[in-house]
Swiss-Prot record:
Critical isomerohydrolase in the retinoid cycle involved in regeneration of 11-cis-retinal, the chromophore of rod and cone opsins. Catalyzes the cleavage and isomerization of all-trans-retinyl fatty acid esters to 11-cis-retinol which is further oxidized by 11-cis retinol dehydrogenase to 11-cis-retinal for use as visual chromophore. Essential for the production of 11-cis retinal for both rod and cone photoreceptors. Also capable of catalyzing the isomerization of lutein to meso-zeaxanthin an eye-specific carotenoid. Its EC number is 3.1.1.64, 5.3.3.22. It comes from Cynops pyrrhogaster (Japanese fire-bellied newt). It is a lipid-anchor. This is Retinoid isomerohydrolase. GO terms for molecular function: all-trans-retinyl-ester hydrolase, 11-cis retinol forming activity; all-trans-retinyl-palmitate hydrolase, 11-cis retinol forming activity; beta-carotene 15,15'-dioxygenase activity; cardiolipin binding; isomerase activity; metal ion binding; phosphatidylcholine binding; phosphatidylserine binding. Belongs to the carotenoid oxygenase family. Binds 1 Fe(2+) ion per subunit.
Length: 533
């Protein structure tokens, strides 16, 4: 997976350019042959507006939400996109300025207000963004765009129209939830978010939304908290981006990147800050891993500990003979990776991009093994006896279990991120293949397939081409785990090229099957899904 590709032309900067939405879908030019069974839609979310008037957004996660769709039908492809009409977006367009504070951009008070009105606005409480730019997922028969706050946005997956804003606080006890819900084959949705727990201390709640029932009532009305994980620090919850789920267990990784609650509550009301200003790193905490029983909600009081890392994406979690196997995309150390994702850094010339990345934590794909059956007589021993992994779990005299991982992939400044698997058939189960977006000094420049058993790697890469998260789509008559295709949106700013295309790869060997080119630029997208016709 070692990349020799350099990017001196800086074509990656096209990922962070504002674009216009489309009034109607446009037809893509297809080369190659699209599988006849591929009939459906690829839905993607990401930022599409990086400034409002003369005011710039500063962080990668600040731009206004743009919903994308590639439609497949009888070998033809169309592309459509529309801005999500969130309150944040509508007010910004109306007032021609940034109105609501985003992840890394503070929204200054309306300059037209008098001093007294502006003073009062500081003390009217936190106005949380509903800029749902990160992901899109189904709940029952509906589809929602999401970010990491308490707001999700119901959208029409056919027309991309915005339907309504939903505040999850009206249904369950959470302050916000991740943009990485895990969805079971029956349609049950699980997610995790932080909340106030017992004795006014923070905790982390697992929220369950059931599938659509015979009464056709909106499943969100039936959402409930099924598990609560404790917080290691009363007023400093950890940042959580994803979690692990098996048929019988839920895994939560508590990392040393913390949200300072006092700073968070005072930032808007007193000193004017953004979300990024409220994060801090706990340099001595390391990482705590928590496990609960999925069916009963019982928290297992087993103290799993390991050295510090940042975590955003779980690859997969499964059970094997009394152990939980937890595969993660890690960044070594306690420093917050998001510190390196300001747009000014991402838009630098290539040599400066590399210099900035040299200072950042190193990426690594790791496998941790968590023993579930603990006996105190085993103090000092490695409790892992699975023959296929070098990961260890040592029971210490203080009754903590110290975990050391098996490294599945590591490359200098080369990350395997935004992982995807054949989730329908292998989510929460023993599996072999993961697909990832390759980041070269944070620049996405390749697509990779990883065999987690043998560590073999397959790569798709072309000069001056910048992919998105790969989406695996299984073929209808699949006999093997990797029978299917991989879909990715490619920005391609090289001379004589179409600005962007949808790439279709053979999921077995990562060879190109087809591409569907469009005559317009497509900015960066974060996450999405394939919706069958």
């Amino acid at each position: 997976m070692s990349s020799k590709v350099e990017h001196p032309a800086g074509g990656y900067k096209k990922l962070f350019e504002t674009v216009e939405e489309l009034a109607s879908p446009i037809t893509a030019h297809v080369t190659g042959r699209i599988p006849v069974w591929l009939t459906g839609s690829l839905l993607r979310c990401g930022p599409g507006l990086f400034e409002v008037g003369s005011e710039q957004f500063y962080h990668l996660f600040d731009g206004q939400a743009l919903l994308h769709k590639f439609d497949f039908k009888e070998g033809h492809v169309t592309y459509h996109r529309r801005f999500i009409r969130t309150d944040t977006y509508v007010r910004a367009m109306t007032e021609k300025r940034i109105v609501i504070t985003e992840f890394g951009t503070f929204a200054f008070p309306d300059p037209c207000k008098n001093i007294f009105s502006r003073f009062l606005s500081y003390f009217q409480g936190l106005e949380v963004t509903d800029n749902t730019l990160v992901n899109v997922y189904p709940v029952g028969e509906d589809y929602y765009a999401c970010t990491e706050t308490n707001y999700i946005t119901k959208v029409n997956p056919e027309t991309l129209e915005t339907i309504k804003k939903v505040d999850l606080c009206n249904y369950v006890s959470i302050n916000g939830v991740t943009a990485h819900p895990l969805i079971e084959n029956d349609g049950t949705v699980y997610n995790i978010g932080n909340c106030f727990g017992k004795h006014f201390s923070f905790a982390y709640n697992i929220v369950k939304i059931p599938p659509l029932q015979e009464d056709k009532e909106d499943p969100i009305n039936k959402a409930k908290v099924v598990v609560q994980f404790p917080c290691s620090e009363r007023f400093k919850p950890s940042y959580v981006h994803s979690f692990g789920l098996t048929p019988n267990y839920i895994v939560f990784v508590e990392q040393p990147v913390k949200i300072n609650l006092f700073k968070f509550l005072s930032s808007w009301s007193i000193w004017g800050a953004n979300y990024m200003d409220c994060f801090e790193s706990h340099e001595t905490m390391g990482v705590w891993m928590h496990v609960a029983e999925k069916l009963t909600g019982e928290y297992l009081n087993i103290k799993y500990r390991t050295s510090a890392f940042n975590l955003f994406h779980h690859i997969n979690t499964y059970e094997d003979h009394g152990f939980l196997i937890v595969d993660l995309c890690c960044w070594k150390g306690f420093e917050f990776i998001y510190n390196y994702l300001y747009l000014a850094n991402m838009r630098e010339n290539w040599e400066e991009v590399k210099r900035n990345a040299e200072k950042a934590p190193q990426p690594e794909v790791r496998r941790y093994v968590l023993p579930l059956d603990i006996h105190k007589v085993d103090t000092g021993k490695n409790l892992v006896n699975l023959p296929y992994t070098t990961a260890t779990a040592i029971l210490r005299s203080d009754e903590t279990i110290w975990l050391e991982p098996e490294v599945l992939f590591s490359g200098p400044r080369l990350a395997f991120e935004f992982p995807q698997i054949n989730y329908k058939k292998f989510g929460g189960k023993d599996y072999t293949f993961a697909y990832g977006l390759g980041l070269n000094h944070f620049v996405p420049d390749r697509l990779s397939k990883l065999n987690v058993k043998t560590k073999e790697i397959w790569v798709w890469q072309e000069p001056d081409s910048y992919p998105s998260e790969p989406i695996f789509v299984s073929q209808p008559d699949a006999m093997e785990e990797d029978d299917g295709v991989v879909l990715s949106v490619i920005v391609n700013p090289g001379p004589g090229q179409k600005p962007a295309f949808l790439l279709i790869l053979n999921a077995k060997d990562m060879s190109e099957i087809a591409r569907a080119e469009v005559d317009i630029n497509i900015p960066v997208t974060f996450h999405g899904m394939y919706k069958k016709a």
